[in-house]
A protein has these predicted regions:
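N-terminal secretory signal peptides that target proteins for export/translocation
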Residues: 1-16
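Bacterial N-terminal signal peptides
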Residues: 15-33
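Short, well-ordered beta-strand segments enriched in hydrophobic/aromatic residues
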Residues: 55-65
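A beta-strand/beta-hairpin structural motif
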Residues: 58-60, 138-160
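Structured domain cores in non-transmembrane regions
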Residues: 71-143
C-alpha cells in the first residue's frame, strides 16, 4: 500500500512539475517582444489535374517557421498542422454542395536523445503521443521535415464521375497550425504571437480545361 501511494505521489509530482514548466514557458512566450521574423505561409503552386478517373490536387507551400515556434519545438513541444481541400459546386438556392474532400494531419516533434526530427503524417487526426495509424519519418534537420509538409502532391479530392463539366465548381484549400492541439497555456499565449497564427486559405475555380 505504501509503495502504491509513493508511486502515485511521484507521478503527481512529475505531472505538476511538467505543468509548471509549460506554464512558465507559455508566460515567457506571451511576455516576450515580437520577433523581427515571424512564421509565414503562402503558395507557389495550386493546381488540379485529371488522372485515372480522379481529380488530383497539387500544392506547393512557401512555409517558414519563426524563431519563437522553432524555439518551442526544440524545447520539446510537438506542433500539429492540418491541410484540408474540398471540391464544391455552386448552388444559388442553397449551400454549396460538397463533391469530395481530403485532409492531411501532421505532427512535428524534436527528439532530443537522437537530435532528429520526427514527422507523423495521417489522413486522420493524430493523438498527442503521435501513436496512430500514421506514416512516421525521421529527419536530420528541421528544414528536411518542413520540405515534406510543403509538398502536397497527387491528393485525390474527388471522383471525376461526380464532376459536372457544365456546372460551376471550385476547390477550397486551407492549411493551418492546429492551436487546439497545444497545451492549454500555449493556446492562450499563442493568440498574442504572430508565430503561432499560421493559417492560409485559397480557392481555385475549376474550368473545362482542367477537368476534361
Amino acid at each position: 500500500m505504501t509503495g502504491f501511494i509513493t508511486h502515485c505521489w511521484k507521478s503527481a509530482g512529475f505531472n505538476l512539475r511538467r505543468c509548471c514548466r509549460w506554464l512558465l514557458w507559455a508566460w515567457l512566450m506571451a511576455c516576450a517582444p515580437v520577433w523581427a521574423q515571424t512564421s509565414s505561409a503562402d503558395m507557389s503552386e495550386f493546381k488540379v489535374e485529371r488522372q485515372d478517373g480522379s481529380l488530383l490536387l497539387n500544392v506547393q507551400l512557401k512555409l517558414e517557421l519563426g524563431p519563437a515556434l522553432e524555439d518551442a519545438l526544440v524545447k520539446g513541444l510537438a506542433v500539429h498542422f492540418v491541410a484540408d481541400a474540398e471540391v464544391m459546386r455552386d448552388r444559388w438556392y442553397w449551400y454549396d454542395k460538397k463533391l469530395g474532400m481530403v485532409s492531411r494531419y501532421y505532427r512535428l516533434a524534436y527528439q532530443p536523445l537522437t537530435r532528429r526530427w520526427r514527422l507523423n503524417v495521417s489522413s486522420e487526426p493524430i493523438a498527442h503521443s503521435g501513436v496512430t495509424s500514421s506514416l512516421s519519418q525521421n529527419f536530420e534537420s528541421l528544414r528536411e521535415a518542413i520540405d515534406v509538409i510543403r509538398r502536397q502532391t497527387s491528393w485525390k479530392v474527388a471522383d471525376m464521375s461526380d464532376i459536372d463539366l457544365d456546372a460551376r465548381q471550385y476547390v477550397a484549400y486551407r492549411f493551418r497550425l492546429d492551436v487546439s492541439q497545444l497545451p492549454r497555456p500555449f493556446q492562450i499565449a499563442a493568440g498574442n504571437q504572430a508565430d503561432w497564427r499560421l493559417d492560409i486559405a485559397r480557392s481555385l475555380r475549376l474550368t473545362s480545361d482542367m477537368v476534361r
